[in-house]
């Protein structure tokens, strides 16, 4: 029997998936718990329409992210911070700091998408990568100067 899952069901599938299960499992477990609905012709058409809409949204979001990455690729983010005599910072430049600075520049980047080779603890030029998905990344420069 074909059903459309309304909630995630372990070892069966995820929300919105069209799956084939035994009739007894559907009638005795899935339907009473409102975990699935029978896949009637109307529901299948609705399911397919929702899948197309979701796919279009996903493509649009990926295109927008790629455009944003193209804008920030090669950008230099400058920090003016206090440092000791040996050019060691009194603190660290974190991904949160970089995200906030990019926000000031008009680019909305989540801190979890920014990857540093190593923590920034000294003055100078450093590199960071903004990575959304495999193959979708932009390289930015981090300049740390004495305040």
Swiss-Prot record:
<keyword id="KW-0699">rRNA-binding</keyword>
<protein>
    <recommendedName>
        <fullName>Large ribosomal subunit protein bL9</fullName>
    </recommendedName>
</protein>
<keyword id="KW-0687">Ribonucleoprotein</keyword>
<keyword id="KW-0689">Ribosomal protein</keyword>
<keyword id="KW-0694">RNA-binding</keyword>
<dbReference type="GO" id="GO:1990904">
    <property type="term" value="C:ribonucleoprotein complex"/>
</dbReference>
<dbReference type="Pfam" id="PF03948">
    <property type="entry name" value="Ribosomal_L9_C"/>
</dbReference>
<dbReference type="InterPro" id="IPR020594">
    <property type="entry name" value="Ribosomal_bL9_bac/chp"/>
</dbReference>
<dbReference type="InterPro" id="IPR036791">
    <property type="entry name" value="Ribosomal_bL9_C_sf"/>
</dbReference>
<dbReference type="Pfam" id="PF01281">
    <property type="entry name" value="Ribosomal_L9_N"/>
</dbReference>
<dbReference type="InterPro" id="IPR000244">
    <property type="entry name" value="Ribosomal_bL9"/>
</dbReference>
<dbReference type="InterPro" id="IPR009027">
    <property type="entry name" value="Ribosomal_bL9/RNase_H1_N"/>
</dbReference>
<dbReference type="GO" id="GO:0003735">
    <property type="term" value="F:structural constituent of ribosome"/>
</dbReference>
<comment type="similarity">
    <text>Belongs to the bacterial ribosomal protein bL9 family.</text>
</comment>
<dbReference type="InterPro" id="IPR020070">
    <property type="entry name" value="Ribosomal_bL9_N"/>
</dbReference>
<dbReference type="InterPro" id="IPR020069">
    <property type="entry name" value="Ribosomal_bL9_C"/>
</dbReference>
<dbReference type="GO" id="GO:0005840">
    <property type="term" value="C:ribosome"/>
</dbReference>
<dbReference type="InterPro" id="IPR036935">
    <property type="entry name" value="Ribosomal_bL9_N_sf"/>
</dbReference>
<comment type="function">
    <text>Binds to the 23S rRNA.</text>
</comment>
<dbReference type="GO" id="GO:0019843">
    <property type="term" value="F:rRNA binding"/>
</dbReference>
<dbReference type="GO" id="GO:0006412">
    <property type="term" value="P:translation"/>
</dbReference>
């Amino acid at each position: 029997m074909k059903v459309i899952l309304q909630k995630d069901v372990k070892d069966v599938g995820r929300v919105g998936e069209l799956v084939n299960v035994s009739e007894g499992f559907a009638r005795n477990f899935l339907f009473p718990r409102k975990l699935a609905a029978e896949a009637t012709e109307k529901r299948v058409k609705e399911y397919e329409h929702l899948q197309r809409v979701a796919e279009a949204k996903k493509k649009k979001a990926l295109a927008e992210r790629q455009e944003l990455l193209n804008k920030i690729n090669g950008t230099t983010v400058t920090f003016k911070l206090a440092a000791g005599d040996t050019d060691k910072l009194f603190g660290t430049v974190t991904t949160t700091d970089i995200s906030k600075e990019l926000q000031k520049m008009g680019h909305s980047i989540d801190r979890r998408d920014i990857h540093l080779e190593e923590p920034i603890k000294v003055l100078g030029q450093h590199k960071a990568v903004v990575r959304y998905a495999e193959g979708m990344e932009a390289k930015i420069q981090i300049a740390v100067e004495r305040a």
